[in-house]
């Protein structure tokens, strides 16, 4: 991945029951369960190849997903991605842990810019006492009603990443859960 400047690689493997099957590999070569942003790109690529209908059905290591592509004029549009259900949320002193396809630690902070994402993130990511499989680490700042900023240390990439779709999902769930906003849509600002 470093030769082309990417953080991951996705491979399509055909499936008899579904439109396609996605396998995700991190920059360090390890297999990942899911990548939300990668899945959106994968669905758009499948559309480009003429695979499936307007709604794509595909599996990833974490389970079966759907991707519904809605086109606006030209290349613009929206991809609505069906993620796995979150079955459990664990919490500690100012942090939460959940799985949105991959494991995510979420910590609410007052100033996301003041966080040493690589230093703190690495320490939490490798805290096998709390997270035996390791975890992605998200630092989240609420900037308004329905608006948050997020920075993520990504497992497998092993440094801060510019954007993380499963992390954004985790951040929205935890912001709503922890603050009981009742908001179902969030605008999430990430570095990328």
List where the protein language model places each region.
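Internal active-site segments that recognize and position negatively charged phosphoryl groups
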Residues: 93-115
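A mid-sequence, solvent-exposed acidic-amphipathic segment
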Residues: 110-157
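Short pre-catalytic strand/loop immediately N-terminal to key active-site residues, enriched for Gly-Thr
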Residues: 30-33, 153-162
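A structural signal for short hydrophobic beta-strand segments in well-ordered beta-sheet cores
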Residues: 12-13, 67-69, 140
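Residue-level signal for inorganic ion chemistry
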Residues: 36, 101, 140, 165
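Single conserved hydrophobic/aromatic residue that forms the stacking wall/gate
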Residues: 1-5, 9-10
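Acidic, low-complexity central loop/insert segments
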Residues: 27-99, 169, 173-192
């Amino acid at each position: 991945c470093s030769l082309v400047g990417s953080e991951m690689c996705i491979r399509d493997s055909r499936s008899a029951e579904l439109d396609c099957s996605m396998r995700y590999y991190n920059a360090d070569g390890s297999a990942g369960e899911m990548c939300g942003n990668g899945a959106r790109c994968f669905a758009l690529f499948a559309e480009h190849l003429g695979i499936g209908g307007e709604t794509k059905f595909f599996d990833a290591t974490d389970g079966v997903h759907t991707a519904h592509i809605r086109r606006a004029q030209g290349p613009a549009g929206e991809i609505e991605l069906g993620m796995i259900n979150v079955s459990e949320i664990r919490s500690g002193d100012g942090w939460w842990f959940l799985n949105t396809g991959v494991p995510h630690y979420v910590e609410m902070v007052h100033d996301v810019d003041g966080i040493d994402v690589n230093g703190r993130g690495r320490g939490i990511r490798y805290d096998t006492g709390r997270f035996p499989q390791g975890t992605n680490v998200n630092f989240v700042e609420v900037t308004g009603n329905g608006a948050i900023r997020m920075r993520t240390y990504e497992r497998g990439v092993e440094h801060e990443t510019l954007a993380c779709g499963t992390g954004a999902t985790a951040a929205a769930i935890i912001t709503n859960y922890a603050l009981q906003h009742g908001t179902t849509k969030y605008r999430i600002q990430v570095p990328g």
